[in-house]
Regions:
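A glycine-rich helix N-cap at a beta->alpha junction
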Residues: 74-88
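Metal-dependent catalytic neighborhoods of phosphoester/phosphodiester hydrolases
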Residues: 39-46, 70, 245-255
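Conserved catalytic cores of phosphodiester-cleaving nucleases, focusing on short active-site segments
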Residues: 1-3, 103
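Active-site neighborhood of phospho(di)ester-bond hydrolases with catalytic His/Asp-centered motifs
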Residues: 3-6, 23-31, 60, 177-182, ...
Length: 275
């Protein structure tokens, strides 16, 4: 699942040694070039590599219309099916729903530009099997899967063994939210409440707070305020203005409010297992 697709997306995928065949869904937060213009090229490359199956593109209507026109010209006979899912700028959509993951949208505040964020919620996991107790109570193999989802076990003599005796609590489900371009907004805090990891843009530091407001962006301090208000586990800052030589002021501002803040770096991998 690829979230936003700037012109450097293919290069980043190659550096990370990600196979093109792994791209099944592309989520586009808004139609500014640094988030969208790499997508036509990526779709063409997928066809060139004869990737099969289906790629679902989740995008606003003008972007879908443009993609259809471009693909009709440069790659009209793709090796895979492209399924377009039109996004609602008001948010509130479920754009992906599998047995293990749900992806929903929420509205961002990026000036006059329609823009949404994405929230990824892992679905509740099954309970862990207590092998010693399962063997002790001689639970048949074909009954074990039902134990994972809360079923009790009834012995041949009618004795009921409670599920809690045979299982251990499940691993906590994880969640992640992505806020691409947005001004400070309490509604965003509501949308990302309780996630384990929040990516939030921090284009400016407080020295350019007025510019951030004018351009529909946030400062690092504002991003941390959103994260703290939402009770997130960790804040990941990105989308920094090129007017800064480094991100030291961003990190310092944010950590004054939320110490568990880190800076996004090219090629970074973050595990939620320890969150």
């Amino acid at each position: 699942m690829l979230v936003d697709c700037g012109e450097g997306a293919q290069l980043s995928m190659r550096r990370a040694r990600l196979k093109y065949s792994r791209v099944t869904d592309v989520l586009i937060s808004h139609l500014h070039g640094d988030h969208f213009l790499g997508l036509p090229g990526l779709l063409s490359t997928l066809s060139l590599h004869e990737v099969g199956g289906k790629v679902r593109v989740h995008c606003f209507r003008p972007g879908i219309e443009l993609l259809r026109h471009i693909m009709a010209v440069v790659a009209h006979d793709t090796s895979f099916e492209i399924e377009y899912n039109e996004l609602d700028p008001r948010g509130g959509q479920t754009v992906f729903d599998s047995k293990s993951l749900t992806v929903t949208t929420f509205r961002l505040s990026h000036g006059q530009t329609p823009c949404v964020g994405f929230r990824f919620d892992e679905k509740p996991k099954g309970r862990h099997i207590n092998g010693d107790m399962v063997r002790y109570h001689q639970v048949p193999v074909w009954k074990i899967e039902s134990l994972r989802w809360g079923a009790d076990f009834e012995k041949p003599d009618g004795t009921v063994i409670p599920n809690e005796t045979l299982t251990l609590p499940p691993s906590p489900s994880k969640s992640y939210a992505y806020c691409s371009d947005t001004a400070y907004s309490h509604k965003v805090a509501e949308a990302v409440r309780g996630v384990d990891l929040l990516y939030h843009e921090a284009t400016y530091c407080e020295d350019n707070g007025s510019k951030a407001a004018e351009r529909g962006h946030s400062t690092a301090r504002q991003a941390a305020m959103i994260a703290a208000e939402a009770g997130v586990g960790q804040l990941l800052l990105g989308h920094f203005s090129k007017s800064y030589v480094d991100e030291e002021c961003h990190l310092a501002e944010a950590r004054e409010i939320l110490p568990n803040t880190i800076i996004a770096k090219e090629g970074m991998k973050i595990s939620l297992l320890g969150q």
